[in-house]
Regions:
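A short gly/proline-enriched turn/hairpin at secondary-structure junctions
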Residues: 53-66, 80-83
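A mature extracytoplasmic/lumenal domain signature
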Residues: 62, 94, 108-109, 124, ...
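Surface-exposed, charged secondary-structure patches
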Residues: 70-114
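Short, low-complexity N-terminal intrinsically disordered segments enriched in polar/charged residues
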Residues: 8-49
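Hydrophobic pocket/interface hotspot
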Residues: 34, 46-47, 55-56, 71, ...
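Positively charged n-region of N-terminal signal peptides that target proteins for export
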Residues: 1-4
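Short beta-strand edge/turn micro-motifs at domain boundaries
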Residues: 119-141
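Structural motif
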Residues: 52, 98-99, 129
Length: 141
């Protein structure tokens, strides 16, 4: 009986690990799609990674901002053209799947531009919405 219980627990953990791995890969794909869109000066494509909702939270140097449209408008003001956008690079330091629909990501970003190379860190909360991972909370510094 103990052997059967151990086998069942092992199978469950294996399935959980596989599911988590699939979710982590899907999250990396969302972030990579954002990076590619950014580097093609496609701000709308970049915004596809965010939850299109008034409940989206973005925290940057201006403090908390709420909503997809407000976040998009702020990006347009700060990055009006390809030169301002530069080339985005990031390093993912940690992806933690909390459950099947929520995850946190910790990472480092770098913009390579002609005259400077600003950089910082980000913490993202992603949620699986209608089967797709979306950034619902972004704290970037």
């Amino acid at each position: 009986m103990k052997k059967l219980l151990l086998i069942l627990i092992a199978c469950f953990l294996c399935e959980f690990s596989i599911a988590q791995s699939k979710d982590q890969k899907a999250i990396v794909q969302v972030l990579e799609s954002q990076r590619l869109a950014w580097n093609n000066a496609d701000l709308l494509g970049y915004m596809n990674g965010y939850w299109h909702s008034d409940s989206l939270v973005f925290i940057g140097k201006r403090g908390p901002q709420y909503g997809w449209q407000k976040t998009y408008d702020n990006y347009l003001k700060s990055y009006p053209d390809k030169a301002a956008m530069g080339e985005l690079h990031f390093t993912l330091l940690k992806i933690e799947c909390i459950d099947s629909k929520n995850a946190f990501v910790l990472g480092k970003w770098l913009l390579k531009r002609e005259k400077d190379e600003p950089q910082g860190y980000f913490t993202l909360r992603l949620r699986k919405i209608k089967g797709t991972w979306k950034v619902v909370y972004d704290h970037s510094s």
